[in-house]
């Protein structure tokens, strides 16, 4: 399938960012979560940690204090599901109220009024050419900073079992090393090679058609996190399904992450978090102190701290134990990971 779409100029709404609500870390025994649900974790080039929530906007830890940006601070998004940084150091947020750009001083909001496919955003990536690809409830948009262009994918059967009522919803977008674009939908994965778009589904060996996340690891394997049948990966045209015989339990997987050492991490609903070191799958959960069975994202920052986000907020894993991290911390690792 070739690119097809519309072009339109953008005159997005800008709002100066007032001083954010700030909490400074202090010694405390009571943990007040950053938010009841953390959906996305991202570290920008200056070392600030951003935490996208499922209803409270975004929180930012700058190494000294936590800043909160929500509707009260003129940040219109409530659920923040995607965070990226462009080459000009602007931070982009994919939210349930449109695409939001933060330049360090003000927020600029882009919605369907400017040409976005849908205001409910689920994924964003910046490709090798610097273009934003935005996966929404109503399809895919590309954005060059001035103009939105629609990218057409085939309609798929909605996944009503998980509340997906749209034929165009795109859960995730990934660009592989060859430059191909991958899209996760309720009808399997689609891969675009610059000329045509190919569907990859259960008929081809995919473990489940409801794809929540896609990752290419450093070895070139393409991993899929699915909603009903866990994790699988693809080498060439061959799929390998990760199951209980590999030591992995559960079926609902939302996130895939490769750490700097090449380990693959993925949380599975009601089964904690798994790490694959290339040979063995290791589970981390209640035995290590994790107090929730609903982790949705994992991330290692440049200082080596490993973060987990999900229901009940933010957690940090030091290699042996998992602790809750709230508005007042604790933010620093007390022992080497």
Q: What are the residue ranges of the model-derived segments?
A:
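Carboxylate-rich, polar loop motifs that coordinate divalent cations or form catalytic acidic clusters
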Residues: 1-337
């Amino acid at each position: 399938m070739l690119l097809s779409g519309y072009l339109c100029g953008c005159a997005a709404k800008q709002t100066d960012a007032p001083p954010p609500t700030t909490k400074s870390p202090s010694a405390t025994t009571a943990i007040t979560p950053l938010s009841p649900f953390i959906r996305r974790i991202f570290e920008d080039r200056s070392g600030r940690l951003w935490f996208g929530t499922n209803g409270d906007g975004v929180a930012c830890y700058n190494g000294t204090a936590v800043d909160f940006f929500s509707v009260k601070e003129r940040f219109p998004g409530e659920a923040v599901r995607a965070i990226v940084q462009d080459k000009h150091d602007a931070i982009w947020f994919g939210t349930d109220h449109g695409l939001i750009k933060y330049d360090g001083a003000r927020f600029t909001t882009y919605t369907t009024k400017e040409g976005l496919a849908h205001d409910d955003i689920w994924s964003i990536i910046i490709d090798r050419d610097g273009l934003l690809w935005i996966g929404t409830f109503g399809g895919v948009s590309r954005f060059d900073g001035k103009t939105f262009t629609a990218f057409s994918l085939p309609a798929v059967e909605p996944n009503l079992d998980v509340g997906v009522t749209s034929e165009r919803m795109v859960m995730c977008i990934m660009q592989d090393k060859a430059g191909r674009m991958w899209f996760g939908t309720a009808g399997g994965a689609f891969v675009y090679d610059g000329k045509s778009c190919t569907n990859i589904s259960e008929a081809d060996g995919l473990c489940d058609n409801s794809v929540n996340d896609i990752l290419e690891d450093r070895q070139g394997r393409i991993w899929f996190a699915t909603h009903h049948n866990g994790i699988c990966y693809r080498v060439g045209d061959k799929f390998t399904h990760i199951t209980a015989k590999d030591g992995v339990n559960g079926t609902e997987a939302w996130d895939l992450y490769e750490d700097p050492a090449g380990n693959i991490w993925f949380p599975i609903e009601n089964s904690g978090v798994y790490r694959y070191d290339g040979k063995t799958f290791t589970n981390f959960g209640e035995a290590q102190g994790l107090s929730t069975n609903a982790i949705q994202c994992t991330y290692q920052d440049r200082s080596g701290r490993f973060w987990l986000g999900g229901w009940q907020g933010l957690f940090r894993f030091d290699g042996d134990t998992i602790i809750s991290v709230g508005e007042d911390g604790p933010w620093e690792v007390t022992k080497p990971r």
